[in-house]
């Protein structure tokens, strides 16, 4: 009789433990699935959202999108698969982010979020290499994307209106690093390695509709891979890196300035195969090309640690100010340039007013300081 009672008690305990474990799993699952709402509820901040911070960690996809009030305090949290190396472009006030395989995240200027596939899943499964977007460009409601492979690049096109399915436009035998669109042509830059130190660039022109190569031109300059901008008149501006140290100088003990390249901002003429220096106040323009809007070019001079505004019509500098940090991103809205500036442990927003040629506001945001943050305003 005692053995039967022991057996019953043992079964009862096992069933109870299984039920408890099951309840814990269900609760944890619910908390995970609704973690956005739980985090937002715990914030207890009901202010209106004025900014969005895209936050990512260096080594995994545990990303977040934080909605911030006017003082930079978080009012809402959305967890997303965002890697540190994500790509983004801004178009008509909306942000488009390549945040995972075969996926683009659209962050609307009103703060709305929308995921969409590059191509249909059934087509996507046929290509087991996956699609990881390197560069994006939007023209007439169509997004063009590059996916670099070893020694070649696939180019995809996606109709943003949803009237047509996404498709692979072409595959070309070049390692594409950047692109922009001029009228009916896709302008691409590709690296050409002569050796480990000497890198030069090819310019490839494709037909935007067919993907066929129309022209390839080779340049002695190395066109920096990440920054390529065009103005309203379809002039193309790039960064060019020119060697400043010889092979013999590289073998010598380190000097105070041992950078291999000097960085210049240049104008690219794709039709006569020339790269022209931009001369401002008698000096060749150096530094990082941030963006071009209307007649103004926005640049960061890393030698002087200064943000600069260049009037391209007058070829003169109209603004210059020291920036204590790294300019992570820029966003243009209502004649104002919003600059997201990061330091080792802080994140700032500088707002430059085009009409007055002044930085009219500087904000500090205390949000996920151990992450990489990209912040921009919402309407």
What are these regions (language model features)?
Residues 36-44, 80-93, 123-140, 171-183, ...:
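Repeated scaffold domains used in trafficking and secretory/extracellular systems
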Residues 17, 145-146, 266:
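N-terminal non-globular leader segments, chiefly Sec-dependent signal peptides
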Residues 6, 131-134, 157, 266, ...:
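Low-complexity, repetitive regions of proteins mediating host interaction that are extracellular
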Residues 1-14:
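N-terminal Lys/Arg-rich, disordered targeting/topogenic segments
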């Amino acid at each position: 009789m005692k053995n039967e009672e022991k057996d019953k008690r043992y079964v009862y305990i096992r069933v109870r433990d299984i039920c408890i474990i099951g309840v814990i799993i269900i609760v944890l699952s619910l908390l995970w699935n609704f973690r956005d709402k739980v985090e937002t509820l715990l914030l207890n901040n009901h202010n209106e959202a004025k900014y969005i911070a895209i936050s990512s960690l260096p080594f995994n996809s545990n990303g977040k999108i934080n909605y911030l009030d006017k003082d930079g305090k978080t009012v809402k949290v959305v967890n997303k698969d965002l890697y540190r190396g994500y790509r983004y472009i801004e178009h008509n006030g909306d942000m488009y982010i390549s945040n995972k395989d075969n996926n683009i995240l659209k962050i609307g200027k009103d703060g709305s979020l929308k995921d969409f596939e590059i191509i249909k899943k059934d087509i996507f499964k046929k290509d087991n290499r996956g699609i990881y977007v390197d560069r994006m460009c939007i023209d007439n409601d169509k997004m063009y994307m590059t996916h670099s492979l070893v020694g070649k690049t696939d180019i995809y096109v996606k109709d943003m209106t949803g009237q047509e399915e996404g498709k692979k436009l072409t595959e070309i035998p070049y390692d594409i690093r950047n692109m922009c669109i001029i009228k009916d042509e896709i302008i691409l830059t590709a690296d050409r390695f002569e050796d480990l130190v000497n890198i030069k660039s090819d310019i490839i022109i494709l037909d935007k509709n067919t993907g066929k190569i129309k022209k390839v031109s080779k340049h002695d300059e190395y066109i920096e891979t990440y920054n390529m901008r065009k103005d309203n008149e379809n002039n193309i501006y790039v960064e060019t890196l020119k060697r400043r140290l010889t092979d013999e100088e590289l073998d010598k003990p380190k000097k105070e300035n041992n950078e291999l390249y000097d960085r210049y901002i240049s104008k690219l003429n794709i039709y006569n195969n020339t790269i022209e220096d931009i001369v401002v106040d008698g000096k060749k323009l150096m530094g990082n090309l941030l963006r071009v809007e209307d007649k103004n070019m926005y640049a960061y001079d890393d030698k002087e640690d200064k943000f600069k505004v260049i009037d391209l019509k007058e070829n003169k500098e109209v603004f210059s100010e020291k920036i204590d940090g790294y300019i992570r991103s820029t966003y243009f809205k209502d004649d104002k340039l919003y600059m997201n500036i990061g330091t080792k442990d802080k994140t700032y927003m500088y707002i430059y007013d085009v009409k007055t040629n002044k930085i009219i506001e500087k904000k500090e945001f205390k949000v996920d300081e151990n992450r990489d943050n990209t912040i921009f305003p919402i309407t």
